[in-house]
């Protein structure tokens, strides 16, 4: 789980009709958040060169009530972090260090651990297929739940250990369709793409992201991390996770499946 301070809810400028000094309607935003039961959000509107609008709404904690702080609140990015994987891959493509349609095994340099679909060994797993979620990788939800543990014990395996454990021809975690013919959302496929970045760049994936994406954007890398330990001095700024549910059993089910999210039932208005 990757965390990033300050932002993080980006609205596309053209999509909400902001031109010149116009700003989004505050009441509309507040009503929209309330409608889908979001306790709080930090919103920023940007174009290619400027920040046009930024504002915090609601709370990062309901009990006790603690408002979202545009400069301090720390959000878990979850799957939004996949955009960083794609950006990193495309940087290496632009540098001609990798090719989107080359078999990823060429970059992994693991002669004794090749990754391929067991039923379609001649169909290469490529970065294009990984980034488009069309590599036919289908690790079960039940297995994915085992990744999540309370606190900093989540994801103790390295990228390589995780990839070669679950994405290999000796497992059953594959769709019965050849790679490239079907789209199926895959966390493990994205992780494999991140491993390629790590191997080609010859540095830890997180270090690559900080040095080649975040620092050039002017992001304070001291406020970015993948573990709670990266934020020992400001853990109070974590935005709490809430589940909207009509009964506590729903929340209990989520907490059993993904305890690291520490979900809390949101009060339901009468």
Language-model segment annotations:
Residues 29, 43, 49, 76-104, ...:
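Active-site SXXK
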Residues 74, 103, 124-128:
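Alpha-helical scaffolds flanking conserved acidic
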Residues 10-22:
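N-terminal signal peptide
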Residues 116-270:
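Short, surface-exposed loop or secondary-structure junction motifs
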Residues 52, 64, 84, 90-110, ...:
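Short, well-structured active-site flanking segments
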Residues 1-8:
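Classical eukaryotic N-terminal signal peptides for Sec-dependent ER targeting/secretion
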Residues 22-75, 97-99, 112-114, 167-176:
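Short, conserved catalytic-motif segment at the N-terminal edge
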Residues 59-62, 71, 103-113, 144-150, ...:
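Short linear capping/connector segments at secondary-structure termini
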């Amino acid at each position: 789980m990757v965390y990033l301070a300050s932002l993080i809810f980006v609205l596309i400028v053209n999509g909400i009709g902001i031109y010149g000094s116009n700003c989004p309607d505050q009441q509309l935003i507040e009503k929209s958040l309330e409608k889908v039961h979001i306790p709080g959000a930090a919103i920023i509107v940007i174009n290619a060169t400027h920040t046009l609008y930024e504002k915090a709404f609601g709370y990062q904690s309901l009990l006790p009530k603690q408002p979202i702080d545009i400069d301090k609140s720390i959000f878990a990015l979850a799957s939004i972090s996949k955009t960083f994987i794609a950006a990193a891959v495309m940087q290496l493509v632009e540098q001609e260090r990798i090719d989107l349609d080359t078999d990823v095994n060429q970059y992994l340099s693991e002669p004794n651990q090749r990754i391929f679909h067991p039923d379609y060994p001649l169909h290469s797993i490529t970065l294009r297929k990984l980034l488009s979620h069309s590599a036919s990788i289908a690790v079960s939800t039940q297995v994915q739940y085992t990744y999540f543990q309370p606190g900093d014990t989540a994801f103790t395996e390295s990228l390589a250990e995780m990839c070669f454990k679950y994405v290999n021809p000796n497992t059953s975690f594959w769709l019965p369709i050849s790679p490239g013919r079907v789209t199926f959302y895959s966390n493990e496929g994205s992780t494999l793409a991140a491993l390629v970045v790590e191997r080609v760049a010859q540095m830890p994936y997180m270090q690559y992201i900080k040095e080649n994406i975040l620092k050039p954007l002017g992001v304070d890398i001291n406020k970015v991390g993948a573990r709670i330990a990266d934020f020992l001095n400001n853990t109070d700024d974590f935005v709490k996770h809430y589940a909207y549910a009509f009964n506590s059993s729903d929340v209990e089910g989520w907490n059993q499946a993904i305890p690291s999210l520490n979900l809390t039932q949101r009060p339901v208005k009468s």
